[in-house]
Curated annotation (Swiss-Prot):
HAMAP family in UniProt: Ribosomal_uL6_B
Stored InterPro entries: Ribosomal_uL6-like (IPR000702), Ribosomal_uL6-like_a/b-dom_sf (IPR036789), Ribosomal_uL6_a/b-dom (IPR020040), Ribosomal_uL6_bac-type (IPR019906), Ribosomal_uL6_CS (IPR002358)
Recorded GO MF terms: rRNA binding; structural constituent of ribosome
Protein name: Large ribosomal subunit protein uL6
Keyword rRNA-binding: yes
Native source organism of the sequence: Methylibium petroleiphilum (strain ATCC BAA-1232 / LMG 22953 / PM1)
Glycoprotein listed as a keyword: no
Recorded name of the encoding gene: rplF
Keywords assigned by UniProt, alphabetized: Ribonucleoprotein, Ribosomal protein, RNA-binding, rRNA-binding
SUPFAM superfamilies documented for this protein: Ribosomal protein L6 (SSF56053)
């Protein structure tokens, strides 16, 4: 059995977990998340702890029990604490501005780039060169951060572009005569 799948998830106070036959829903202060439960995994809620077990002895069921446990742990963390991704703009004249559910970027194109945020995602710009994307669904937060970074990824010679705050960009040397 998967080592990750063996560990139970402690459900914090203020988080409600409902398990149906084919889906699990987690409700907390930051919203509600719903995920289908794989038929190879059985989920039990006992004394405020969620436990996962493979439905049969196959290798796929063992692997899926660990995967489901990790996904549900992210759901529990998301509705209680939330997730955030920070991006940094590097370049002369590069600016970001949050306007409600939209992110307005000026990153060296002849026109400003406007990115709409989906429901449940908040975007903040503490400074003109910083972007903070927050939400309860870890996958959606990471996806939106990747889409924003893809607008102008860091180039390898000067490092200009949009990068994750913790990202290290390795720079190439210029051509020598």
């Amino acid at each position: 059995m998967s080592r990750v799948g063996k560990m139970p998830i402690a459900v914090p106070k203020g988080v409600d977990v409902a398990i149906n036959a084919d889906q699990i829903s987690v409700k907390g202060s930051l919203g509600t998340l719903v995920r289908p439960v794989n038929r190879l995994v059985s989920v039990k809620n006992e004394d405020g702890k969620l436990s996962f077990a493979p439905a049969d002895e196959s290798a796929a069921a063992n692997a899926m029990s660990g995967t489901m446990r990790a996904l549900v742990a992210n759901m529990v963390n998301g509705v209680s604490k939330g997730f955030e991704r920070k991006l940094t703009l590097v370049g002369v004249g590069f600016r970001a501005q949050a306007q409600g559910a939209k992110l307005n970027l000026q990153v060296g194109f002849s026109h400003p780039v406007v990115k709409d945020m989906p429901a449940g995602i908040k975007v903040e710009c503490p400074t003109q060169t910083e972007i903070v994307i927050k939400g309860s669904d870890r996958q959606v937060v990471g996806q939106i951060a990747a889409e924003v970074r893809a607008i102008r990824p860091p180039e390898p010679y000067k490092g200009k572009g949009i990068r994750y705050a913790e990202e290290k960009v390795s720079l190439k040397e210029t051509k020598k005569k």
